[in-house]
């Protein structure tokens, strides 16, 4: 069967995808970006890069004064491969692999709750959306970073399903963890993300909420593409 064309108008636009950890935001957003021919921006990777820098310097990630002090010394960059893969650079060094280590997750969550860090990265993220049509995923894209995005999606799934998916992902990366531990960490991060003072995780009032608990990857991707197509036409 011939694949249907996406039929998205040729105009500048932004798609904001928010949701809790492990909801599949990055995997789906990357696939949709490739389908639509637009830039994919994984803001979680940007915060992971800050978290990695903080850990490497031995700084307590919740110590805002200490974290703020090193921000001017950090040059955060991105490089895109031909296949659209986003690589993160820290002071010129490719840290894409390092920031995905399991222990960086809690550092990323902690530093992302700091107003100083969010302010430091906000203009960088907005500048990308001004220069390119983007699909950007994170925790506060539709509410804070791109409040005027043409399409806003809040992607979610049950904690149990997200934990199962994360376990599979970690196993594929060669860094397996027990399901109970992954579930506990997800629940902890959900609480931290939704209760932080700076830009807590929540769906924008005009966001379309999509629960993928009962959907596989292909069904989730097609559902999101249909929503985006409907909003932009």
Give residue spans per PLM region.
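Extreme N-terminal, non-catalytic leader segments
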Residues: 1-14
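Hydrophobic anchor at the beta1->P-loop junction of P-loop NTPases
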Residues: 17
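Walker A (P-loop) phosphate-binding loop of P-loop NTPases
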Residues: 22
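Conserved lysine of the Walker
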Residues: 25
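Hydrophobic positions on the alpha1 helix immediately C-terminal to the Walker A/P-loop
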Residues: 28
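N-terminal phosphate/diphosphate-binding loop that engages ATP/GTP or pyrophosphate donors
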Residues: 34-101
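Small-molecule kinase domains that catalyze NTP-dependent phosphoryl transfer to phosphate-bearing small molecules
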Residues: 80, 125-131, 141-144, 148, ...
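ATP-dependent NMP and nucleoside kinases share a basic, alpha-helical "lid"
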Residues: 96-175
